[in-house]
């Protein structure tokens, strides 16, 4: 089932297990998925920052995504497809969706500085992967060095109907959640799922501000 703006609950951010020689540890992927399922997660996110995607070539990344997707039959799987080029992003996004992923996740590249650069980048990313693929907007300025204001996030979401979720990981970021939910109340922002990160450190407060759950993990 594809991800929608009504998504909520807990999505575990999965690490990618490796053997000592650098090969992907596929049996450990299966065990990770089984644990996430047993504890009641609603979904799993793979090949994110915690998933160490830059350590893999395109074939390995696709294989990891597919292994998670095929094992996680009762979970919605979100695949991180951020890349330095749109061709690689498109290839992994299409392969992941063909394998049964619920959505993909896209982060801004660290060189983006102005609001126009940020909004244009995501428009081009959607054109590259196809507007039929639901996607998660990753907002993690502490690591990615790209600051997206609530107004910029609103423009990205309104310009790209296939964006169904915000992975919110700003710190401090409570006012950002409040602002986005305020936009929805005044009709300037359509429905959008908001899941938060930061190790769930502020989850109680984030839920009070209108978050729909958490997308986070530990390794």
Language-model segments: what does each one mean?
Residues 2-147:
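Active-site beta->alpha loop and helix N-cap motifs at the rims of alpha/beta catalytic domains
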Residues 128-130, 140-219:
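Catalytic alpha/beta core domains of metabolic enzymes, predominantly
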């Amino acid at each position: 089932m594809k991800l929608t703006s009504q998504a909520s609950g807990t999505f575990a951010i999965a690490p990618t297990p490796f053997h000592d020689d650098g090969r992907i540890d596929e049996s450990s992927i299966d065990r990770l998925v089984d644990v996430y399922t047993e504890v009641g997660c609603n979904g799993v996110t793979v090949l994110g920052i915690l998933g160490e995607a830059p350590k893999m070539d395109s074939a390995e990344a696709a294989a990891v995504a597919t292994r998670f997707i095929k094992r996680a039959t009762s979970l919605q799987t979100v695949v991180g497809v951020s890349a330095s080029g749109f061709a690689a992003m498109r290839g992994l996004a299409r392969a992941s969706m063909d394998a049964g992923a619920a959505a993909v996740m896209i982060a801004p590249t660290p060189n983006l500085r102005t609001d126009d650069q940020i909004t244009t980048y995501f428009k081009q990313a959607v054109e590259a992967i196809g507007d039929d693929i639901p996607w998660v907007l990753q907002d993690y300025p502490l690591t990615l060095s790209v600051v997206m204001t609530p107004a910029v996030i609103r423009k990205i979401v309104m310009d790209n109907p296939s964006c169904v979720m915000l992975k919110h990981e700003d710190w401090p970021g409570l006012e950002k959640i409040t602002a986005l939910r305020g936009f929805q109340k005044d009709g300037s922002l359509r429905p959008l799922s908001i899941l938060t990160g930061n190790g769930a450190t502020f989850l109680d407060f984030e839920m009070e501000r209108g978050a729909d759950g958490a997308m986070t993990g530990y390794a």
